[in-house]
């Protein structure tokens, strides 16, 4: 654009010869530029990352299953000749039971096996099995020709009992349980301390408590504490509901209890939680009709497993109930249930803590007075306080708001605590606990 004198203000190249030609970067310059901005250990980190990628690639090649839609290895890794030879050499085995070992101390011991519904045989061991692996009463796998013992088998356990084992840990921790600080401390003394610090009990010469009874009104956090224990401990956790052990046929419930403890003894450390134990643990009586005889047999088997002739081993037992007054005295005695923990109604501090626990996962205002709300919920259980938080969220959704206000909580208190008081069974259960 020209200025006031008419000269053009745009810059022009006066001399094309002064421009230097563009020179391409060589490999040395590129390597130098790559070093800019790198830390001291960048080269070592890069080398380790490359090694990890190579190992992952090698693992995927060896497995050849994860990246395949059919679940098969790549055809390049197939060995059909070896697979065919394996199928011809390995024949299906038959399940039998070793009833007696003859001349066990000799170099060539003999074993009496019982093939179910067929016959009994005196057999030898195959070359793959050591004599120390076979015991009397054990299930074994034998071939169909010479009936030689090829493999020891684990004890037979009902699949219903196996399904009671908790594989995935619950997502509940001790910080998610409010109003039960004293109860959690007592529970951890029984469950965690013997597993983590057994030398303390050995030095004192005492055996740690092995059984705990959790009792209290409904909704006070008994099952919630058991879920927190399952999350905390690394031991095997088995969950049993009392009504699952009530079976139709005679002896089925007692057999399930027996197999349950057999499976627990195979673990290094085990924790069994019986929920609603009053379903099978009621006091024994004779009604004249014999309707509860099977339930009483199941309870007697449970009593025998807890503290009978055979030692229990490293098995901790938790039991929860709303009606401790109905339990049999033989089940309640020390040695079977050493500690009784009462879960009473939470106090003001506990109710405030429970409100904060449930509100921290909600979108709420910052200046909500939780202590005031806790004062408006006297004699309330933790389940009722959780229902208050849920109803407060429902009031906010009904008003098409994204956050819950203190007014929503006040309306929820009026609805849950005051309007639903006629449905509450807490006063009646308080007379039983």
Curated annotation (Swiss-Prot):
N6-acetyllysine modified-residue sites: 116, 422
Region described as Disordered: 1-22
CDD domains for this protein: RecA-like_PAN_like
Entry keyword annotation includes ATP-binding: yes
PTM (free text): Monoubiquitinated by RNF181.
One of the GO biological process terms: ubiquitin-dependent protein catabolic process
Record family assignment: Belongs to the AAA ATPase family.
Name of this protein: 26S proteasome regulatory subunit 7
Species, as recorded: Pongo abelii
């Amino acid at each position: 654009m020209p200025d006031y004198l008419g000269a053009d203000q745009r810059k022009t190249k006066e001399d094309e010869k002064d421009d230097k030609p563009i020179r391409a970067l060589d490999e040395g310059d590129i390597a130098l530029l790559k070093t800019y901005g790198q830390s001291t250990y960048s080269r070592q980190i890069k080398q380790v990352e490359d090694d990890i990628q190579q190992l992952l690639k090698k693992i995927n090649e060896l497995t050849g299953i994860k990246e395949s839609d059919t679940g098969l290895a790549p055809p390049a890794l197939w060995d059909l000749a070896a697979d065919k030879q394996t199928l011809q050499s390995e024949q299906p085995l038959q399940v039998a039971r070793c009833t007696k070992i003859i001349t066990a101390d000799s170099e060539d011991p003999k074993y009496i096996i019982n093939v179910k519904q067929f016959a009994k045989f005196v057999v030898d061991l195959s070359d793959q099995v050591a004599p120390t692996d076979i015991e009397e009463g054990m299930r074994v796998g034998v071939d169909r020709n010479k009936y030689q013992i090829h493999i020891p088998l684990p004890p037979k356990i009902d699949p219903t009992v196996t399904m009671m084992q908790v594989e995935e840990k619950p997502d509940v921790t001790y910080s998610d349980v409010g109003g039960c600080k004293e109860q959690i401390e007592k529970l951890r003394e029984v469950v965690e301390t013997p597993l983590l610090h057994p030398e303390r009990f050995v030095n004192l010469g005492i055996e740690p408590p092995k059984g705990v009874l959790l009792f209290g009104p409904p909704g006070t956090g008994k099952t919630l504490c058991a879920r927190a224990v399952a999350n905390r401990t690394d031991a095997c956790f088995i969950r049993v509901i009392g009504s699952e052990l009530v079976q139709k046929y005679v002896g089925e419930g007692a057999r399930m209890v027996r197999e349950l403890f057999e499976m627990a003894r195979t673990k290094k450390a085990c924790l069994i939680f019986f929920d609603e134990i009053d379903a099978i643990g009621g006091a024994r009586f004779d009604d004249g009709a014999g309707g509860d005889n099977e339930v009483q047999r199941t309870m007697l088997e449970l009593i025998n497993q807890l503290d009978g002739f055979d030692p229990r081993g490293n098995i901790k037992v938790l039991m929860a109930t709303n009606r401790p007054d109905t339990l049999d005295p033989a089940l309640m005695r020390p040695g079977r249930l050493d500690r009784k923990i009462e879960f009473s109604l939470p106090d003001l501090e506990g109710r405030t803590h429970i409100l904060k626990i449930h509100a921290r996962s909600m979108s709420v205002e910052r200046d909500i007075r939780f202590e005031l709300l806790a004062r408006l919920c006297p004699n309330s259980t933790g389940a009722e306080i959780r229902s208050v938080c849920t109803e407060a969220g429902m009031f906010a959704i009904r008003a098409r708001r994204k956050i819950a206000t203190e007014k929503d909580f006040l309306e929820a208190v009026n609805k849950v605590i005051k309007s639903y008081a006629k449905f509450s069974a807490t006063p009646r259960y308080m007379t039983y606990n």
